[in-house]
UniProtKB/Swiss-Prot annotation:
EC number(s) per entry: 1.14.14.1
Record's catalysed reaction(s): an organic molecule + reduced [NADPH--hemoprotein reductase] + O2 = an alcohol + oxidized [NADPH--hemoprotein reductase] + H2O + H(+)
Entry keyword set: Endoplasmic reticulum, Heme, Iron, Membrane, Metal-binding, Microsome, Monooxygenase, Oxidoreductase
Recorded GO MF terms: heme binding; iron ion binding; oxidoreductase activity, acting on paired donors, with incorporation or reduction of molecular oxygen, reduced flavin or flavoprotein as one donor, and incorporation of one atom of oxygen
Protein name, per record: Cytochrome P450 2C25
Enzyme class: oxidoreductase
InterPro entries: Cyt_P450, Cyt_P450_CS, Cyt_P450_E_grp-I, Cyt_P450_sf, Cytochrome_P450_fam2
Induction summary: P450 can be induced to high levels in liver and other tissues by various foreign compounds, including drugs, pesticides, and carcinogens.
Amino acid sequence: MDAVLVLVFILSSLVFLSLWRQSSERRKLPPGPTPLPIIGNFLQIDVKNISGSLTNFSKVYGPVFTLYLGMKPTVVLHGYETVKEALIDHGEEFAGRGDFPMAERINKGLGIVFSNGNRWKEIRRFSLMTLRNLGMGKRNIEDRVQEEAQCLVEELRKTNGSPCDPTFILSCAPCNVICSIIFQNRFDYKDQDFLTFMKKVNENVRILSSPWLQVCNNFPSLIDYCPGSHHKITKNVNYLKKYILEKIEEHQESLDIENPRDFIDYYLIKLKQANHNQQSEFSLENLTTTVSDLFGAGTETTSTTLRYALLLLLKHPHVTAKVQEEIDQVVGRHRKPCMQDRSHMPYTDAMIHEVQRFIDLIPISLPHAVTCDIKFRDYFIPKGTTVITSLSSVLHDNKEFPNPEVFDPGHFLDKNGNFKKSDYFMPFSAGKRICAGEGLARMELFLFLTTILQNFKLKSMIHPKDIDTTPVVNGFASLPPSYQLCFIPV
């Protein structure tokens, strides 16, 4: 009986504390729905369609509102003007990385994606500089992507025009590009170490996209005490870091300071230079996490976009025909597509932009945090508050993109058929935390897609009108449904 009374007292105290904290915080923060004790507004959010839930809230509370995901407040930014004002006009103040408990348990604040403060600035600056250096070498990044595009074509030829699921092959190509940048070497598509490594990376992205992970991130105590797929992420990350560490040790043995070969070499040189600096952010542990981040951010996202692009091209054969006509006119059949071609291929460029806009791959981006107390649109947001941005509300703005739910490359073409830029194009987010690999990803999408369409006719297994392009998961990432197609050589 005493134990029951103690439990009731503890639960009552928690409820009271939750109510007291929420009432005092809510007086200062932007408006929002009334939260329940402990669980906040979680039951009011569709974890399978978070962006849709945010749109519904914005209709009631405006473009800046507060949700309680658990006991902590989260400020939501909805619509282009609001997102731009925060991430670009007040970029420094909104440059923090917000709460993502699952990643914090794994990365311990290291790496480039989930780090904060000076550590994040140092690692990001170094990573961007190194990618530029690798792009300006004797064998630059475009050469690597072109080489991989040809390997991709050869693998697709092996299907002999038979029906196939393109998921595996389209995952190999961008993963191999990252391998060549990080490890210097690409891998054969049948290499078992490569296949296992790629499988772990892709599996983690899929788990991170699941509704269960959204629950874990909002109630972090579940991470330690409940069974579930989140434990698989930890095992996969441990495997990836062990593999990466083995590669680092190989590089240490063969390092030539005067002739860095890849990202790891550049980092090891930086590590030697900072060896006597106790305040340095450069360590072997940070290197393994940074490399893991680069693979996680730069492989599955690009391969998913490629997979979605082919599905949309099957759904809209008239678009495919126009792209292939442009490829024939500009590139022809006897040379490889290159990045210089893009400025002469406005329809193809518009098609790729429209794929990224339409699929809305990362609907709410990763969480931001304010780095200091800030008054934003007459609301006070305390330092450290988590902020999420609805990229869906920008990419699917019906004034900038008429009929935004329709796939139409015309959204990025002017009346004369020239490519038309849009400030609303934010699939890589915006501001200080914009994706560090944006340039590489855009290069891969252009070169991989044009090379595929230069060499193959895409044949659907069903009538185009029956093709479903609805994402199967719409939590952290929007993933396309499984499908098969035939790559018919031309």
